[in-house]
């Protein structure tokens, strides 16, 4: 999971 995308 990429929370900085």
Swiss-Prot record:
Organism per entry: Litoria rubella (Desert tree frog)
Record GO biological process: defense response
Tissue-wise expression: Expressed by the skin dorsal glands.
Gene Ontology cellular component list: extracellular region
Protein name stated in the entry: Rubellidin-1.1
Signal peptide: none
Subcellular compartments: Secreted
Function: Shows neither neuropeptide activity nor antibiotic activity.
Keywords: Amphibian defense peptide, Secreted
Keyword Lipid biosynthesis set for record: no
């Amino acid at each position: 999971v990429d929370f900085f995308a």
